[in-house]
Structures are given as structure tokens and as C-alpha cells.
């Protein structure tokens, strides 16, 4: 996977945690490969309804490892959740609090929960920690609200999908110094890889599409998004000064 990523010109990877059970493997990989970084968090759809999962102390301990450069992914997802969702709100608040305490930015997921996501980010002081709205699939007003809080917005392979007009509208408007590009692997492989397992190398296809959409050359977009990554995640070590 790493060899294919390197061959595609992808020099750095952030392996995002969706549960603490898998975090150990992510951290081990990040310690072995200097171009791979880790995040620590629990996805809103994981362990649904568990008010104390993860506990404050479990999450606080998880984010302490030096290869962990971010807290998340966290956030709100009402698409597949039903009933009382207070546990999601509490879990999101817990992640924000720890992000502020340790000074590591947030990786935020939001789906069908725009109002509550932005409201909690404002109430809990997420702007103090900073972060990114990852795999963004919502509308421009939501993106603008996050940008106003100092957050970045990350575009995935969804932007290449035929029915993704809303995402393309957002992708055109994100300021260049707040734009990131990602895979969300193993899901959401971009065109021309739809139907296949997504992997880091495919971010090059999304970047190529995004560059054309925004009317810039690929080299410029690749350099800008790489610079943005290291600006957002200052604990990530850049191997070379000018590479991406």
C-alpha cells in the first residue's frame, strides 16, 4: 500500500482512528514508517448508545503517544442512528475537551447533523484546538461556519461522483489555504476506481479532479494541500522541506 502511494506521488499519510481497539495497530505502523501519522478517537457510529465509550481517561491516554497528531475522528452522524442521540453529543464534547487540553487538532465527521455539529463546536470552544471537517459531504453554509471557526475542509473522492453537485460547489469555494484532500480509505474510492477498495494512492486521482475543478494545475494544488496539512498538524514531522 505504501509503495503504491509513493509511486502515485503521495508522500505522507494520516491513519485515522475510528475506535480505540484498532488504535494500537495504527500507532505501531506510525512508529515504523516515518511518513505515516496517527489520530486517536472514536467514530460517532462506533459502539452506538454507549454513554461512556470511550471514557475520558481511555481517550486521554490514547492521545498521549507522540505519533498521534490529532484527536478523532469524532463528530455527529444522524444518518444511521435512531432514538436518543445524547450519547453522541456527549462523546463529541469529550473529544473536543481533550483536544483542547492536549493541543492536538480535531478531525470532525458530520452527516445529517450540521446544526448540532456546528453548535457544539461553538459551545465547546473547538476553535481553540482547530481541526478539519473531514470527508466533507454537506452544504456550503456548514463549510463556511466551520471555516469561520478556523477549521480546514477536506475533500474526498465523493467530489468525483456524478451526483455530488453540492460537494463540488463547496470544493470550488474553499480558500486555498484551508483546503485538504483525502481518501477516507477503504471507502469512497474516486472515479475511475469506484467499486474497488480505496487506498492512499487514489488520493492523486481526487487531487487531479479537484485541481481541474478549481482551475489550478495539479502541482500547485498538491503543494498547497501538503503545506496546509503540516500547518494544521504541527506535530507531524515533514521529511523534506519542499516535497509532497
Q: In which residue ranges do the predicted regions lie?
A:
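Mid-domain alpha/beta scaffold segments of enzyme catalytic cores
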Residues: 1-244
Amino acid at each position: 500500500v505504501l509503495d503504491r502511494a509513493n509511486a502515485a506521488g503521495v508522500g505522507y499519510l494520516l491513519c485515522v482512528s475510528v475506535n480505540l481497539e484498532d488504535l494500537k495497530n495504527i500507532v505501531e505502523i506510525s512508529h515504523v514508517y516515518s511518513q505515516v501519522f496517527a489520530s486517536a478517537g472514536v467514530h460517532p457510529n462506533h459502539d452506538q448508545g454507549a454513554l461512556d465509550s470511550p471514557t475520558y481517561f481511555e481517550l486521554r491516554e490514547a492521545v498521549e503517544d507522540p505519533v498521534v497528531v490529532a484527536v478523532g475522528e469524532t463528530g455527529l452522524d444522524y444518518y444511521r442512528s435512531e432514538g436518543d442521540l445524547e450519547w453522541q453529543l456527549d462523546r463529541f464534547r469529550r473529544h473536543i475537551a481533550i483536544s483542547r487540553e492536549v493541543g492536538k487538532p480535531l478531525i470532525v465527521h458530520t452527516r445529517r447533523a450540521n446544526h448540532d455539529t456546528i453548535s457544539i463546536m461553538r459551545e465547546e470552544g473547538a476553535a481553540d484546538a482547530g481541526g478539519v471537517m473531514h470527508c466533507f459531504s454537506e452544504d456550503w453554509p456548514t463549510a463556511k461556519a466551520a471555516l469561520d471557526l478556523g477549521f480546514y475542509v477536506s475533500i474526498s473522492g465523493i467530489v468525483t461522483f456524478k451526483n455530488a453537485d453540492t460537494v463540488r460547489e463547496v470544493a470550488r469555494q474553499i480558500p486555498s489555504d484551508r483546503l485538504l484532500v483525502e481518501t477516507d480509505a477503504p471507502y469512497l474510492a474516486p472515479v475511475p476506481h469506484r467499486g474497488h477498495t480505496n487506498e492512499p494512492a487514489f488520493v492523486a486521482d481526487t487531487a487531479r479532479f479537484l485541481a481541474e475543478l478549481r482551475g489550478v494545475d495539479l502541482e500547485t494544488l498538491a503543494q498547497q494541500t501538503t503545506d496546509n496539512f503540516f500547518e494544521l498538524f504541527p506535530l507531524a514531522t515533514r521529511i523534506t522541506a519542499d516535497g509532497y
